[in-house]
Every structure is written in C-alpha cells, then in structure tokens.
C-alpha cells in the first residue's frame, strides 16, 4: 500500500513538472521570450543598481548605497527643507557617471545658477515646463519609454494641475481629480520604469488634514497612489541653522527613510545643506567619522590618524576642504565601515512624521 502511494506521488510530481513546462512555453509563445522566467536563472535580476544621493550618510542609511534605478522615489517635506536640492544632487551624481537626466519643472521655479553650483551639467539636462499635469506626466512617460534617460525628476506633484482645473473657473471645486490623475499615470508608468531601468523622483509637498485628534495631521498631496507605488520615500526636514558668527550660512537637515523596499526602513541621518553649495560633504565626513570611530574627538579637537583636523567642527570642515587627500581617506574608511554606521543611525521617532507612513 505504501509503495502504491509513493508511486502516485512520483507520478503527480512528473505530471506537475510537465504541466508547468507546458504552461511556461504557452506563455512565452503568447507574450514573447523572457515574459516569464525563474528568478535565480539570471544573476542580473537580483543585483540592485543605485545612484548616489550626494550625501554619504543618506547612501548608507538607504542600505544599498544610494537610490535604486528602475524604481519610483518620493521626496517630501515642508517648504525650503531641501527637497529640490537633494533631487538635483542625485541628477549631478547620475551625470558624473555619464547618465542622461530630465527635469520636469511643473512649479516653473528651477534656478539654473543654483543647479550648476550643485554640479548639474545644464548643457545636457533635459528640462520641461509643462502647462498641465496631463502634459507633464505624458512627457515623463515618453521619456521613460525611450529607455535612454537615467533619472527623471518631477517637481512637484502638488503643481501637477489637471487640465479641467486650469480651464475651469477660479474657486470651482473639483474633488479628487489630481489623485485620479496620479493613480492613472502611475499605473501606466510602473512597468515602463522597471523595463527601462529609469529612476523617477517625485518631489511632494505637505498638507494638513482637518479635524485630526490623534496622530500627525500631516499628509502628502496627490492621493494615496504614490505612497504605494514608491519603492523609497524620504521625509526631509530643516531642524536648525548653520551659523558663521551671526550670519546664517546653511540649514541643518534631517532625512528619515520612511519607506524602503530595498533594505530595512526607518533609518534617519542628519547633515548640513550650505547656501550656494548644497550638501556639506566635509561636515558629513566629520560627523560620520566620529560615529564610526574613524575620526577621534577629544574635547573640542578632532583628529584622524594622530593628525589634528582642527578645534571645533567648522575648523575641522575647513581643514578637510583644504586637504582633499585626507577627506578621501576618511571617506574610504567610512564606506568600508558602512554596516557599522548603519547600525548606529538612530531610528525614526515612534510617533513618525506622517501617520500614514507605516501603511505604505
């Protein structure tokens, strides 16, 4: 009896294998070769290609060394928090590797002089200033399907105004129209983005929900679709000022990885954004160096390999700016200790910045 049962199981196994092979060949005949495959059959499928954010600390916090290609990214935060700066840094890093980038300026507010200071190659940057939200997303879809563009930035979701709203009267109520526009566009874009390996960065603004008694009243514009389709969501906030004597020369910025499909989320990192310069790389080297034990701190003095960098953080930053070889050595040491640094990053506060961050 046991032998008969064993033979039946073996025959079922053979039948299943044959049935699966027949199904796979039928799918490939109908939809083309490569429409279905075993994940382990191609090593390239598993690898995650990334582009640096321009911030060493944020690259480490993301867990994969930067923002992933072929994915949708959302960067949101209050006004003047550094959203566009972070997106432009990513564009500059992609261009350094020979990539082609596009900037869809729905807000009509891109400053070319500032972009150049951040390292963006303006001569090779594709820019569009569309009239309507439909036009902006159609341009984005066409660029993605071309397969020739590496990074596309949409600035911002809040400025993607539906055509019906522009053609209607001022004050006319059109509830949910922008959310429907985003939902339809993202359904179309997702498959094309994955196939073309293009990174699409959506910059978003924050709004307040009325009548919220418990939890954060903050939410992002454009409905819920972007929260679900985004592989990485970054919450960027200004937490203080960087001062040179009495003059404010930059912002202290905190970025929380609210959602991450590539690595564990909820890591957060702090860095300086200097006016006219962007992310302060030397400031990050000092802060991360101390956190990783690469840079020693005794009182107000910072030192590296028994060499004094300066008294006080600002003097240490100036020393690294004037001595790029030492800065390069520290950066190399930090990249080798990336895992250790990631563990030491503080997790985001339990209350979170958006009450719906956990849902997405």
Swiss-Prot record:
GO CC term (a single one): cytosol
NCBIfam families recorded: tigrfam_recA (TIGR02012)
Source species of the chain: Chelativorans sp. (strain BNC1)
UniProt binding sites for ATP: 77-84
Protein name: Protein RecA
Keyword hit for DNA damage: yes
Function: Can catalyze the hydrolysis of ATP in the presence of single-stranded DNA, the ATP-dependent uptake of single-stranded DNA by duplex DNA, and the ATP-dependent hybridization of homologous single-stranded DNAs. It interacts with LexA causing its activation and leading to its autocatalytic cleavage.
Annotated signal peptide: none
Subcellular location: Cytoplasm
InterPro entries: AAA+_ATPase, DNA_recomb/repair_RecA, DNA_recomb/repair_RecA_CS, P-loop_NTPase, RecA-like_C, RecA-like_N, RecA_ATP-bd, RecA_C_sf
Gene Ontology annotations of biological process type: DNA recombination; DNA repair; SOS response
S-adenosyl-L-methionine keyword on record: no
UniProt GO MF annotations: ATP binding; ATP hydrolysis activity; ATP-dependent DNA damage sensor activity; damaged DNA binding; single-stranded DNA binding
Alphabetical list of Pfam families matching this protein: RecA, RecA_C
UniProt family annotation: Belongs to the RecA family.
Domain of life: Bacteria
